[in-house]
Amino acid sequence: MTKLLFMGTPDFSATVLKGILADGKYDVLAVVTQPDRAVGRKKEIKMTPVKEVALENNIPVYQPEKLSGSPELEQLMTLGADGIVTAAFGQFLPTKLLESVGFAINVHASLLPKYRGGAPIHYAIINGEKEAGVTIMEMVAKMDAGDMVSKASVEITDEDNVGTMFDRLAVVGRDLLLDTLPGYLSGDIKPIPQNEEEVSFSPNISPDEERIDWNKSSRDIFNHVRGMYPWPVAHTLLEGNRFKLYEVTMSEGKGSPGQVIAKTKNSLTVATGDGAIELKSVQPAGKPRMDIKDFLNGVGRNLEIGDKFGE
């Protein structure tokens, strides 16, 4: 039985780990995941999804803040693993660890060489891609630059957002990994180098990138909101306060970008660079998320045609 170290953090990773454990061909010696974090308004300490799966299966868990140079790194290197599998781990693996095992592969949620980095699904949706996917790749010291072992693609529809794509790609990645590993370990599957001329990057989303640019097209803003949902969530300003947009649809109309151009009891339409969007689900500053009807009948009741978002 092949002995593995598994490294990952979110639900995407947990789905992959569950698949490995259910497959029965691999012995997961240990799991490495990010430290427990305080989440939500109450700042409650929460385990990562991968840690939860590991504990349910009595697998030792390591949670270094930074793996490189940590005592945990030295401990991991003494376990005698044959290889490493990572999926959305969130840290670079030290070269000495990579060199201590027979193989190290990563389940990356993009069709490499496009979208190397930590937010490939976000950028695929924001940029209006028609498909996303998963690449199984060998790990090297350079980020997401290793040779590609296998790929699988998935259509992106207008109904998709980061959450739906994460869920679908986790299952695709799990199945692709389990289909690929036997042939890779036997040498029947030969990894292929990435074409460096086709490389693009998807770094972690910065706070500035969450902000809506109302001068952009309706399609771009629609994609932007979907590409930020359910996290980190797109936002704009309303009367100088942060105003989050969870769901919008493309609409028609003309006006100055960011300007309210239509309002009823149940709908609110805002002008964009080439048309308009209709707001569906929002969160005003200091309030919970709400649908647009509740907003317009509550804190947004004084909003008028001609008022501007983004200011």
From Swiss-Prot:
Keyword Protein biosynthesis listed: yes
EC number, as in UniProt: 2.1.2.9
GO molecular function: methionyl-tRNA formyltransferase activity
Alphabetical list of SUPFAM superfamilies matching this protein: FMT C-terminal domain-like, Formyltransferase
Chain residues that bind (6S)-5,6,7,8-tetrahydrofolate: 110-113
CDD domains: FMT_core_Met-tRNA-FMT_N, Met_tRNA_FMT_C
GO CC terms in record: cytosol
Function, as annotated: Attaches a formyl group to the free amino group of methionyl-tRNA(fMet). The formyl group appears to play a dual role in the initiator identity of N-formylmethionyl-tRNA by promoting its recognition by IF2 and preventing the misappropriation of this tRNA by the elongation apparatus.
Protein origin, superkingdom: Bacteria
Family membership noted in the UniProt record: Belongs to the Fmt family.
Protein name: Methionyl-tRNA formyltransferase
Pfam families attached to this UniProt entry: Formyl_trans_C, Formyl_trans_N
Keyword Transferase assigned: yes
Catalyzed reactions: L-methionyl-tRNA(fMet) + (6R)-10-formyltetrahydrofolate = N-formyl-L-methionyl-tRNA(fMet) + (6S)-5,6,7,8-tetrahydrofolate + H(+)
Keywords (A to Z) from UniProt: Protein biosynthesis, Transferase
UniProt-listed PANTHER family: METHIONYL-TRNA FORMYLTRANSFERASE, METHIONYL-TRNA FORMYLTRANSFERASE, MITOCHONDRIAL
